[in-house]
Swiss-Prot record, chains A, B:
Signal peptide: none annotated. S-adenosyl-L-methionine binds at residues 82-83, 88, 120, 169-171, 186-188. Belongs to the methyltransferase superfamily. SABATH family. It is an enzyme of class 2 (transferase). This is Indole-3-acetate O-methyltransferase 1. Its cofactor is Mg(2+). Catalyzes the methylation of the free carboxyl end of the plant hormone indole-3-acetic acid (IAA). Converts IAA to IAA methyl ester (MeIAA). Regulates IAA activities by IAA methylation. Methylation of IAA plays an important role in regulating plant development and auxin homeostasis. MeIAA seems to be an inactive form of IAA.
């Protein structure tokens, strides 16, 4: 089981803060198999598998509760928000289709037709996603059940659902009113819709001069990031509440943090707020990048605490919280030999690049971007042992249903 | 008003017969404006504009008749099949949304929410299409009407509908049952799902040895092409009948021919069955391409007669024919100076390349493909006057509704 960050860059990516490739973590773990054997990775892969199974269990629990509540329509619609280019999204959709079909079957009803929407920003590489889709299962009577009964192999060889791609931001409306039975969004909601304006405004007390992320920033900066996250999540919930069918459900997972302090971003802080920060400072001191250039760069990511997340859901009021937990996840660093400092350094640079490379290149160009990640690699290698020990993510995992 | 073929090649095109870029004609005329003044094009642009307006009128008539029949739901769904990378499709969708909104308004009802599906093969460049989409109009009460009232400029600046891309072949199922109000497909249905098998089988009496298109081919070849077209259209209609909502409608336009003889393909015949054919023969005689290589290449396009089209719709039986006409269209050749033989030759080669270039390159490679189109350009230049006079398309235009 690999710990890889699954973010991919499309060929035609239009660069903007909101268009950055998504951080993907659990989802990629969930659908990857094999690897180089137990203990070959930085963290214990068995512990990882446990976490992954636990989160998958949450999703299934969400679906089961929904099937208890809802009537059995002839059409079941699902939407995965922040689908990226695909394989993780396809795995989650397979879980949904299988579980819902089983629920229909256990009530002695014919399985519904499924329609699945894969949504992401217009800059996402939908072409790759669409070419990953297996061919549609011929809608012959009984064949859906046969396919599901045949297990995973068959389920990925054909596709027992109608598929569609939906370009747009999930911080606004994406679907007609009351049209979706189940929403999922895994590892996208920690991406803010934008860097908070005050944070880039040198006249503001929340100006994040000198720093490139909220981690270890001032109280005013931290408050601005928190406000942005909560405003974005509120807009997300307001749109979904309009789009969800009566009896529908939503499964959300995103980066989270265990600390109450917004300026202590945990794993995300270690990723963007320490050696990555120092690498920027290196470039400024070497005269490669001007100080103002660094000051105007900020990573639009925020790992919320459970409380911050819960407050937004409650204030919105449209959804009941069926489950809300902070789950300890793994490390984004993929290494075969955790004792090899050079390899750890490379893994750290690669992880950062996979997530923030597009943003960095758009801000200072590819050439200086490459220099930045070289500095990062060198610095991370010098702190390899500490990174191996301390680098891991927490995830907010949340199951919601429309409040009665 | 330009006569350009609007086919575009996506960057990640997976080549297969069915994945060839679509022939686009009317749709591009409909949404193009300006040009280099009256009479600057090969054909009289005013006559073209008349044809275009007439076909647009058919679409509006189809919509009006549908609005008479159907109840006013809160959600109106449209699907454009064979959307290619977009601008033509976006224009047609704008017409639909505007017309349907006006119909609701004239009955004193609130405009519905619109959901529009853009469908094409998985190899289509959906990324380009999605980046052409204007941003979603904020669903504020009254703003849809304001937008529509503001006319074309506003309608293209924002998007008063939810959009989704659907990858798949329209010769099979694409959507859930009874989920679409109106289908459109413009200039795609003349693409066969495949070259008829017999045509590529040297042991068959319908083997098309020596030729690369059905035009001027043997009776057996012509019959095989005709069978393939009719079988494909039947599969198209069967799927749409399942997917269309009660009271729904369908507007179809594709290449057609005025001759009763399937081996006389009219404009398509002139495009693929004369100088293009001779250019292949040149390469064979020069030893650049082996005879068998040419013999195994066939263009999977078929321009049906009205009667052939009508027979399939009647045999299927699910749809009533509200209108079925053969409309004289324009020429695919874009030239500023019709007297300039070299320019006419270039235009002919470009038109052929835009439609069949991907297929040719997949069959004999890019280098020899370029040689083929060079020969074509030279030959077409020698027959420039004849091409200017005789090259024009006919279009089958068809409006269908679910039979009661």
């Amino acid at each position: 089981m690999t710990m890889a960050m699954a973010s991919m860059k499309g060929e035609n990516v239009t660069v903007s803060a909101a268009a950055a490739p998504r951080m993907k973590k659990l989802a990629s773990m969930l659908c990857m198999k094999g690897g180089n054997g137990d203990g070959s990775y930085l963290n214990n892969s068995q512990a990882q598998a446990l976490h992954a199974r636990r989160m998958l269990h949450f999703l299934e629990e969400t679906l089961d509760a929904m099937m208890e509540r809802s009537s059995s329509d002839k059409l079941f619609t699902a939407a995965d928000l922040g689908c990226s280019c695909g394989s993780n999204s396809l795995f989650i959709v397979d879980v949904i289709v299988r579980r819902v079909s089983e629920a229909y079957e256990s009530r002695g009803r014919d399985a519904p037709e499924f329609q699945v929407f894969f949504s992401d920003l217009p800059s996402n590489d939908f072409n790759t996603l669409f070419q990953l889709l297996p061919p549609l299962l011929a809608p012959v009577a009984g064949s859906l059940e046969e396919c599901l009964a045949a297990g995973e192999g068959a389920a990925t060889a054909t596709r027992p659902y109608h598929a569609a791609g939906v370009p747009g931001t999930f911080y606004g409306r994406l679907f007609p009113g009351e049209s979706i039975d189940v929403f999922t969004s895994t590892f996208s909601l920690h991406w803010l819709s934008q860097v908070p304006e005050e944070v880039g405004d040198s006249a503001s007390p929340a100006y994040n001069g000198g720093r490139v992320f909220v981690h270890r920033a001032t109280e005013a900066v931290a408050a601005a990031y928190k406000r942005q996250f909560q405003a974005d999540l509120a807009r997300f919930l307001r749109s979904r509440a309009r789009e969800m069918k009566r009896g529908g459900a939503m499964f959300l997972a995103c980066l989270g943090r265990s600390s109450g302090d917004p300026a202590d971003q945990g794993g995300a802080g270690l990723l963007f707020g320490t050696h990555f920060q120092d690498a920027w400072d290196d470039l400024v001191q070497e005269g490669v990048v001007e100080g103002e250039k660094r000051d105007s760069f900020n990573i639009p990511v925020y790992a919320p605490s459970l409380q911050e997340f819960r407050d937004v859901v409650r204030a919105d009021g449209a959804f009941a919280i069926d489950r809300l937990e902070l789950v300890r996840g793994g490390s984004p660093l993929v290494v075969d030999r955790p004792d090899d400092a050079a390899e750890v350094g490379r893994a750290m640079a690669n992880s950062c690049k996979a997530v923030a490379g597009v943003l960095v290149d758009a801000h200072i160009g590819e050439r200086r971007g490459a220099q930045l990640f070289e500095r990062l690699e060198r610095r991370a290698a010098r702190h390899a042992r500490e990174l191996v020990e301390k680098m891991h993510f927490f995830h907010v995992v949340c199951s919601l249903s429309l409040a009665p």
